[in-house]
Swiss-Prot record:
It comes from the Bacteria. This is 3-dehydroquinate dehydratase. It catalyses: 3-dehydroquinate = 3-dehydroshikimate + H2O. Keywords: Amino-acid biosynthesis, Aromatic amino acid biosynthesis, Lyase. It comes from Streptomyces avermitilis (strain ATCC 31267 / DSM 46492 / JCM 5070 / NBRC 14893 / NCIMB 12804 / NRRL 8165 / MA-4680). Catalyzes a trans-dehydration via an enolate intermediate. The record marks 26 as: Transition state stabilizer. Pathway: Metabolic intermediate biosynthesis; chorismate biosynthesis; chorismate from D-erythrose 4-phosphate and phosphoenolpyruvate: step 3/7. The keyword Amino-acid biosynthesis applies. Its EC number is 4.2.1.10. Substrate binds at residues 82, 88, 95, 110-111, 120. The gene is aroQ.
């Protein structure tokens, strides 16, 4: 059955993992001074440029993120996810994302995870993501929204 969700009738789910509620306060030398509210405004502006909206959420709890992914597969046009530390540990989040057949998923990281500690170099989420954006600061979220919008509009990976 073809997907009937479009940017005009379904939001992009933006999911933020643990400790991102402290964005702007925690390690500003790595993550910058922008707050999560600033990131939400940036994402909303990027989606609006494509006639879309965002459903922006943050949780420090893996199970809640999994529940939201399950919700997104039914009611959203795509997912932008910053799984934060769960990138490197959560098979549960990967498994949830793998249930989202045909739904564009873009992983975003504020810092370049490949320039950080060795344990941060691997991401389980990347195994499902249609794209990964890292090291672009909070602007990476806007890039991720742009990519999800392009994939949602065309349904093509080369969009």
């Amino acid at each position: 059955m073809p997907r009937t969700r479009t940017l005009a009738n379904a939001p992009i789910m933006i999911l933020n993992g643990p400790n991102l509620n402290l964005l702007g306060q925690r390690q500003p030398e790595i993550y910058g001074s922008d707050t999560l509210a600033d990131v939400e405004a940036l994402c909303a502006k990027a989606a609006a440029a494509h006639g879309g909206t965002v459903d922006f959420r943050q949780s420090n709890h893996e199970g809640e993120l999994v529940d939201w992914i399950h919700e997104a597969r039914l009611h959203h046009v795509g997912i932008v996810i910053n799984p934060a530390a769960y990138s490197h540990t959560s098979v549960a989040i990967l498994d949830a994302l793998n249930t989202c057949d045909g739904l564009p998923v873009v992983e975003v990281h504020i810092s370049n995870i490949h320039q950080r500690e060795e344990f941060r170099h691997h991401s389980y989420v990347s195994l499902r993501a249609d794209g990964v954006i890292a090291g672009c600061g909070v602007q990476g979220y806007a890039f991720a929204v742009e990519r999800v919008a392009a994939l949602a509009e065309t349904g093509r990976a080369d969009a």
